[in-house]
Each structure stands twice: as C-alpha cells, then as structure tokens.
Amino acid sequence: MDHGFYPTNLNGEGLRIGIVQARFNEPVCEALREACVAELEQLGVAGEDVLLVTVPGALEVPLALQKMAESGQFDALIALGAVIRGETYHFELVSNESGAGITRVGLDFNIAIANGILTTDTDAQAHARTREKGRDCARTAVEMANLTNDLDGLQDHGQDDDGENE
C-alpha cells in the first residue's frame, strides 16, 4: 500500500464465492449466471471454489445468502435474478424487499455481496443488461472479498493475543 491508498485487487485466486440465482425469469437469470461465472474464471477463481444454488425467485435470495454467510465458507457472495415490471405493485415490493434483504445479510454477517438482481421495465431491457451485469457482479465480488479480507487484517494489527491493543 502506497501513501495509504489501497489499490483495486481483482485477483480471484484462492477466493471462495457463493452464488444464489433466482429461477423466475429464467432466461435472463441463466444469462446473468453464464456471464458471471465466465468472468470469475477470467479473474482466477477456481471452479471448485464456486458454489451455485438456485431459489424460486428474488424474495428467496436473501435467505439462501444468509445460510451461505452463516457457514463462514465464503469470501464473498453474489445474488443474481431479474424482477421485471408487470401491471401490479408486486414489482416494487419484490425489488425493494429483495434489495433490503441482500443488504441486511451483508451487513449482519460482515460479508461482501454483489447484488445482481436486475430491476427493469421490460424483458428487452433485462436481456440487454445481462452480460455486463453478470461480469460486473463477478468483479465486484472479487474486489470486495480482497478488500474486506485485507481490512480484516488491519483489525488484527496492533493487538496482542487476547485482542487487546498493545
């Protein structure tokens, strides 16, 4: 680290990544997953270090993320899904609640979560965003895993074996 600046670290080697993918709007979600997994591989994350689980829809994503976070087995998590506006208020409810749940899990369990739940007005908008959003989630997960792992190391610096400041 130079001059107190932490450089972006997109090296995924040795990182363990959990992915929760919603199945609702499946073609969009599959495209998100494919782009995300391909980018994780490009960043050096080994296939055996990635666990993918699927859930029915975006509202179920936070619970699966919570279970993964509770396990302590992952350096970062990724949420993938698509909420496409319909003719009812359900769109707002699902979008808001899934987003809030994802954020809460990350903060409650001190783990980076890349939120790749697309919220769009149309199928066409969702399909147009899948490739870039999937790749972005992979990059975000790797960068934030490295950052949080390194920042966790700062907490240990300057403490004795009992966790007291020296």
Curated annotation (Swiss-Prot):
Gene3D superfamilies (UniProt xref): Lumazine/riboflavin synthase
Residues that bind (2S)-2-hydroxy-3-oxobutyl phosphate: 87-88, 129
Keyword field: Riboflavin biosynthesis, Transferase
Gene Ontology molecular function terms on file: 6,7-dimethyl-8-ribityllumazine synthase activity
InterPro entries: LS (IPR034964), LS/RS (IPR002180), LS/RS_sf (IPR036467)
EC number(s) from the headed UniProt entry: 2.5.1.78
Pathway: Cofactor biosynthesis; riboflavin biosynthesis; riboflavin from 2-hydroxy-3-oxobutyl phosphate and 5-amino-6-(D-ribitylamino)uracil: step 1/2
Major enzyme class: transferase
Transmembrane segments: none
GO biological process, one term: riboflavin biosynthetic process
One cellular component term from this protein's GO annotations in UniProt: cytosol
Functional note: Catalyzes the formation of 6,7-dimethyl-8-ribityllumazine by condensation of 5-amino-6-(D-ribitylamino)uracil with 3,4-dihydroxy-2-butanone 4-phosphate. This is the penultimate step in the biosynthesis of riboflavin.
Family: Belongs to the DMRL synthase family.
Protein name: 6,7-dimethyl-8-ribityllumazine synthase
